[in-house]
Amino acid sequence: MEKSENNFAFIDSHNLNLGVKSMGWNLDFKKFRVYLKEKYKVSKAYIFIGFVPGNQRLYDALQEYGYMLVFKPIILGDDKEPKGNIDADLVLRAMIDFHENNFDKAVIITSDGDFYSLVDYFCSKDKLKVVMSPYFKTCSSLLKKTAKEKLVFFNNLQRKLEYKRKSTA
């Protein structure tokens, strides 16, 4: 009997959200969790997110959909926008799970070149399933160069993963 894949997703929530919104649509996180499970055999999906006290309903919903939330206290940037600065947390969690041999392959969801070293390392160890970048135009050239054929974009996923408000008729 063939062993089923056990892949983990590591999601840069801020980058994902901004990237999808820059294309004019909102991601349906419930559909996205199902997509990750079915398409990439993701058994555990971590979302790295800055903690905003007023967003508890969102956090509850994400957990209900099957995500593991990893919070970071936010700070206000120079532009007064909240910043979670989750990069180090995502890399640390991914490396702990790699070191403990907890997953077969990693799905990294970001456009941020700060994750180049992680992606490069996972490629060298044959541990990278795919890098999912929200938007081709905003994806780091470092990620494009490193992930190569293992890089996919959300441009073609809108019909499948777009959040549509339920009509209240």
PLM ranges: what are they?
Residues 1-169:
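Terminal and domain-boundary accessory regions
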